[in-house]
């Protein structure tokens, strides 16, 4: 499916973005292993999250869905039923990596697989420490890649230093650590998103954090709770940048998650000169939430590097679009993790923005962008990457002429209402 966009003149209105994808995944995972019934409200029912829901249904967890409310009757992991067929993770790296960690605590053997794109993404970064904890891993086709057969049980706690800053690896080991003997200690090179730690505490569990060290006691049983999922700041990022670069723009985005480990996008946009206000800030389920008001702004170039990168790794494609409209040279570095996302996002962003006339070059760990540039419409290959598709839809709305986004159905992975919201707020 293709998505065609044209230049717009104004943005206005008040909107809500879909529920946070990371929190939606984790609420299903933790609710499924908690004692009692968990209710999750305003959940993101995207393709990725549906993969996680489908996984637990196949293993015997009772999950009822009505609109955007999910009711889960949790069960002990040792009571998961055997499942001899492949468990299909689709294109969801979050599902694959976190669920490998979780089911390493089950005595049964399971096979996880994915679509052709997920099967290109590395998994040994998760399976290697799981093997150290005692899980049995078998690569059924190629080393490091799905499909993977995993058999767990009798895990032991370890001290593991993450080779890269990755919330998915960290979360997989935390979930395994809940079901092992002894204590698991995880050392991060820099802090990454901490939704898993926050939510485990919301479900009555214990996670200790001290600087870059996370400690998890083994053999914990969580207790059911209610979860209200805030709006996803990674989805809001597209609307924030669009509002900053469209000449006549003022937009309110309501009930957005403002977790400090995810809010790097806000700090960078402020550094670039974006006119933003955070209103009605509050705490829900241990997560900061608020409304964001943003207006058109004259942006200036910045350097994005170091510890802030993990807090905005998913927002770099849309920040690259913002940089094409900023005065000066924007440098993005320390972002080599972009190479193993749904696509190689460094190569994809650079090649597709060049089609639109941007002055941009790739580096080994990021990109360099000279702005401002008058973009021109082009045909964009999204590489089936949802964040690429949405970033270039935004670029197309400030470009002269028509922009066509190929394979735009991938947007449903995280933001099914994206095109509808664009139509609602655009003039």
Curated annotation (Swiss-Prot):
EC code: 2.5.1.19
Function: Catalyzes the transfer of the enolpyruvyl moiety of phosphoenolpyruvate (PEP) to the 5-hydroxyl of shikimate-3-phosphate (S3P) to produce enolpyruvyl shikimate-3-phosphate and inorganic phosphate.
Compartment list: Cytoplasm
Superkingdom to which the source organism belongs: Bacteria
Residues that coordinate or bind phosphoenolpyruvate: 21, 93, 121, 168, 345, 387
Source organism (scientific name): Alkaliphilus oremlandii (strain OhILAs) (Clostridium oremlandii (strain OhILAs))
Gene3D superfamilies in UniProt: Enolpyruvate transferase domain
The protein's name: 3-phosphoshikimate 1-carboxyvinyltransferase
Gene designation per UniProt: aroA
Catalytic activity: 3-phosphoshikimate + phosphoenolpyruvate = 5-O-(1-carboxyvinyl)-3-phosphoshikimate + phosphate
A Pfam match: EPSP_synthase
């Amino acid at each position: 499916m293709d998505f065609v966009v044209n230049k717009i003149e104004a943005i206005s209105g008040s909107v809500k973005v879909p529920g946070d994808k990371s929190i939606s995944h984790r609420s299903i995972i933790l609710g499924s292993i908690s004692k009692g019934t968990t209710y999750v409200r305003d959940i993101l029912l995207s393709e990725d999250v549906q993969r996680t829901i489908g996984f637990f249904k196949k293993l015997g967890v009772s999950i009822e869905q009505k609109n955007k409310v999910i009711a889960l009757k949790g069960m002990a992991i040792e009571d998961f039923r055997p499942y001899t067929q492949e468990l299909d993770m689709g294109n969801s790296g979050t599902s694959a990596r976190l669920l490998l960690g979780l089911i390493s605590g089950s005595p049964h053997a399971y096979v996880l697989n994915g679509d052709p794109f997920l099967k290109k993404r590395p998994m040994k970064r998760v399976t290697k420490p799981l093997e150290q904890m005692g899980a049995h891993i078998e690569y059924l086709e190629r080393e490091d890649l799905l499909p993977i057969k995993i058999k767990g049980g009798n895990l032991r706690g370890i001290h593991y230093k993450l080779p890269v800053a990755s919330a998915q690896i960290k979360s997989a080991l935390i979930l395994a650590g809940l079901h092992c003997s002894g204590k698991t200690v995880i050392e991060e090179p820099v802090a990454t998103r901490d939704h898993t730690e926050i939510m485990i505490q919301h479900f009555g569990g214990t996670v200790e954090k001290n600087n870059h060290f996370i400690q998890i006691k083994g053999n914990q049983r969580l207790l059911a709770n209610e979860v209200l999922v805030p709006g996803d700041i990674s989805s809001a990022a597209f609307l924030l940048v669009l509002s900053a670069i469209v000449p006549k723009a003022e937009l309110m985005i309501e009930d957005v998650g403002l977790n400090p480990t995810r809010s790097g996008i806000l700090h960078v946009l402020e550094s670039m000169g974006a006119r933003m206000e955070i209103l009605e800030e509050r705490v829900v389920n241990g997560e900061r939430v608020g409304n964001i008001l943003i207006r058109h702004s004259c942006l200036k170039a910045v350097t994005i590097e170091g510890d802030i990168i993990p807090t905005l790794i998913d927002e770099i494609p849309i920040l690259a679009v913002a940089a094409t409209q900023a005065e000066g040279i924007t440098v993005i570095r320390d972002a080599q993790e972009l190479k193993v996302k749904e696509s190689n996002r460094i190569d994809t962003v650079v090649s597709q923005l060049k089609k639109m006339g941007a002055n941009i070059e790739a580096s080994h760990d990021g990109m360099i962008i000279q702005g401002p540039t008058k973009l021109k419409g082009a045909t964009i290959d999204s590489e089936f990457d949802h964040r690429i598709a949405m970033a270039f839809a935004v670029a197309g709305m400030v470009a002269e002429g028509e922009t066509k986004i190929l394979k735009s159905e991938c947007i449903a992975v995280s933001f099914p209402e994206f095109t509808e919201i664009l139509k609602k707020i655009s003039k």
